[in-house]
Design a protein with these regions (language model features):
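Classical Sec-dependent N-terminal signal peptides that target proteins to the secretory pathway
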Residues: 1-22
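Hydrophobic face of amphipathic alpha-helices that form TPR/SEL1-like repeat modules
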Residues: 108-115, 120, 145-152, 179-189, ...
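Canonical positions in the second alpha-helix
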Residues: 97, 133-134, 169-170, 206-207, ...
Length: 384
């Protein structure tokens, strides 16, 4: 029960898809010679999101709550100031209109109080108040976010029953984030309950159909593992590829996609695409991908051998105490020249991961390995 509550003490907020720039340590020139890779750079994270993402290692209660549903205020506007010739400040007007029932203002005020934006001091109780007002208008986004506040005890006492009720209502109204939140809740605690598993699968499917990329990966992974449904690698490849590419760039999707390409499951075996997918996940700091990519470059079987990069990658993984990484790194020492070792050390030392915004959101909200939600609920058939 303690583990159940600890895992669930997270903020299931809807998120806004903004994406971080790729790193260039493991660049095309270093890894695959002249092979080019499309950039996933879109735009920089806004100030409020940067504030929450700095706490990535320990997780953040605030995740990436959805932005205000309107453009009422710019990110730098000081809304408490009264303009010349005006009777009230933008803030006073927004409060008045929120009290008069304006959903737009209720959502914006809830967001600004939660983040302490636009000249307002952060006030969790007021954030809760305005999201509650918006939720009473049956707005699914407000319901989902209010459920998150109840779930985490932000601005109010924790109330799991109210949180789940709000998530369920928001899901019924088509909110893909609420459906996703419910699915993860059903899979928390590794109950291995076929009824809960089926509900989770259906919710992943519902959320994916609404365009949620996290749900798309989970649905693909369910087909990959044979979770609730029979194993179907073609379906797995279809969904996982979408979650790995485009603007989503989910690191775990890239990792599994690389495995599919390596083994030729659901698609034609393609080692170049496998290496490219491993690299993409490694650039986001995915330690499994870093270790697998190191193995690939050390072996030199599916891509040209590169002991410098293999050593650097093992070193990066070893610094995170990844099993066998230090041993594999040390085994390469005897095969490398001093200059190569120096280059490898510098490469590892300069490494800085650059997770996509969606990857950061997943890590902050659901953890660093969301595949475990399915893996830990797999039911092994007793039939022989």
């Amino acid at each position: 029960m303690k583990n159940f509550l600890l895992i669930l003490c997270m903020c299931f907020f809807a998120y806004a898809p903004v994406y971080a720039e790729d790193m260039d340590l493991l660049s095309d020139e270093m890894l695959l010679g002249s092979e080019s890779e499309s950039s996933t750079t879109d735009k920089k994270v806004e100030d409020a999101d940067e504030k929450t993402s700095q706490d990535e290692e320990g997780g953040s209660f605030f995740g990436f709550i959805i932005k205000p549903i309107s453009n009422l205020f710019g990110s730098g506007d000081k809304i408490t100031e009264v303009a010349e010739g005006e009777k009230e400040s933008p803030f006073e007007r927004s409060v008045r209109q929120a009290n008069e029932g304006s959903l737009e203002d209720q959502m914006s005020l809830g967001y600004m109080y939660l983040y302490g934006a636009n000249g307002l001091d952060a006030d969790m109780e007021k954030a809760f108040k305005y999201y509650e007002m918006a939720a009473k208008q049956n707005d699914p986004i407000a319901m989902n976010n209010l459920g998150s506040l109840y779930f985490s005890g932000i601005g109010t006492k924790k109330n799991y029953d109210k949180a789940l009720s709000l998530f369920a209502k928001a899901s019924e109204l088509g909110n893909d984030n609420a459906s996703l939140n419910l699915a993860f809740i059903y899979l928390t605690g590794a109950a291995k309950d076929p009824v809960r598993n089926k509900k989770a699968f259906d919710l992943f499917e519902k959320s994916q159909q609404a365009g949620n990329k996290i749900a798309e990966f989970m649905l693909g992974y369910a087909y990959y593992k044979g979770f609730v449904v029979d194993v179907n690698y073609a379906e797995a490849y279809k969904y996982i590829k979408e979650a790995a590419n485009g603007k989503a760039q989910i690191d775990e999707a890239q990792l599994v996609l690389a495995d599919l390409y390596t083994k030729g499951l659901g698609t034609v075996q393609n080692y170049a695409s496998a290496v490219k997918a491993y690299r993409a996940a490694a650039n986001q700091g995915n330690m499994e991908a870093i270790l697998k990519l190191a193995d690939v470059y050390a072996a030199g079987t599916i891509t040209p051998q590169n002991l410098v990069l293999a050593h650097a990658l093992y070193n990066i993984a070893a610094a995170q105490n990844i099993t066998d990484a230090a041993q594999k790194r040390d085994e390469l020492n005897e095969k490398m020249q001093l200059e190569e070792l120096t280059n490898a050390q510098m490469t590892a030392q300069n490494f800085k991961s650059s997770p996509s915004e969606l990857t950061k959101y997943i890590r902050q909200t659901y953890g660093y390995n969301i595949r475990n939600y399915i893996d830990n609920n797999m039911i092994v058939s007793s039939k022989k």
